[in-house]
Amino acid sequence: MLNVAIVGASGYTGLELLRILYAHPQVAVTCVTSERSAGKRIDEVFPTLRDRCSLVLENLEPVRVSQKADLIFTALPHKAAMAVMPTFMELGKTVIDLSADYRLSDAEVYGAWYEPHLNPELLKSAVYGLPEIRRESIRGKKLVANPGCYPTSITLGLAPLLKNGMIDLKSIIADSASGVTGAGRGAKVDSLYCEVNEGYKAYGVGGVHRHTPEIEQELSLLAGEKVTLTFTPHLVPMDRGILSTIYATPLKGVTTEELNELYRNFYAEEPFVRVLPLGSLPSTAFVRGSNFCDIAPVVDKRTGRVIVVSAIDNLMKGASGQAVQNMNIVCGFYESAGLSGLALFP
């Protein structure tokens, strides 16, 4: 059995990791940490874990955590992961990091969007953990930067078009709508029930959302040249899920049928990407609680523009599910281990 620690276990992504890992046949969770709930049993913080996990949440002490685990999931806010990562690396631990701290390959870009990076030398040793694009680079890696939720939905939605050089790189627009868990478990006025319920709003408008450079970095690597896009996130009054609607101008005429075949071929061997049949469109309801990304490419016959719709669960394929998928790849486990559950519907 692989002994695993979850650092930052009292947030939504921490809970989701526990939910998945307790059904994983080759993993034992041996340590959970939380600064705000240290000393409490994890099933006190999350009653859904009663009779399944009674570990006591500990303060984060990197050396102590390392003594208890072979692989560590860091589900911490940005900057917090940077503070402990050097110790984990020096002690030879494998880390799947769910923060933004190691996703951007350029420390200057990270500094411009977040704050100065505390250990830029580790950026070179980290791999961006989007399995459908970077699987071979992930195998055996010591530090995997788990992708953000919006970047996952958009990158998977555009990858076939970019790899085949089919669209105008200056024409990309992505509108993405997320459930409230995307804002985390901390108390925020903007996340209160009365602030969110019965409403639908855009935020981070004008290219200022912090996922923007991550999206552009990955799209540029796929295209082989610089890509910029217009990205507008939205908040929807639902617990979980992301629906991205992506627009681009094709370089030559193409039909919906041709795109559907292109996408089916591109993702034919992928266990967690489902290209929907012609006439079907993704819904967050049909991926909720699962690690699937549902995709449908469509051509607007009037304008000729390509429209790609993708749906994921932001806590699963957008965070914890993908983190476990990365762990499986790193460790040589069956890639779908612990992740074979279908969506929770209705």
Swiss-Prot record:
Q: In which pathway does it act?
A: Amino-acid biosynthesis; L-arginine biosynthesis; N(2)-acetyl-L-ornithine from L-glutamate: step 3/4
Q: Which GO terms describe its cellular component?
A: cytoplasm
Report the catalytic activity: N-acetyl-L-glutamate 5-semialdehyde + phosphate + NADP(+) = N-acetyl-L-glutamyl 5-phosphate + NADPH + H(+)
Task: Keyword check for Signal, yes or no.
Answer: no
**UniProt xrefs under InterPro entries:** AGPR_AS, AGPR_type-1, NAD(P)-bd_dom_sf, NAGSA_dehydrogenase, Semialdehyde_DH_NAD-bd
Q: Identify the catalytic residues.
A: C149
Coiled coil recorded as keyword: no
Q: Write down the EC number.
A: 1.2.1.38
One GO BP: L-arginine biosynthetic process
- UniProt entry keywords in alphabetical sequence: Amino-acid biosynthesis, Arginine biosynthesis, Cytoplasm, NADP, Oxidoreductase
A Pfam family annotated for this UniProt entry: Semialdhyde_dhC_1
Q: Where in the cell is it found?
A: Cytoplasm
> GO: which molecular function terms?
N-acetyl-gamma-glutamyl-phosphate reductase activity; NAD binding; NADP+ binding
> Tell me, what does this protein do in biology?
Catalyzes the NADPH-dependent reduction of N-acetyl-5-glutamyl phosphate to yield N-acetyl-L-glutamate 5-semialdehyde.
Similarity remark: Belongs to the NAGSA dehydrogenase family. Type 1 subfamily.
What is the designated name of this protein?
N-acetyl-gamma-glutamyl-phosphate reductase
> Which species expresses this protein natively?
Pelobacter propionicus (strain DSM 2379 / NBRC 103807 / OttBd1)
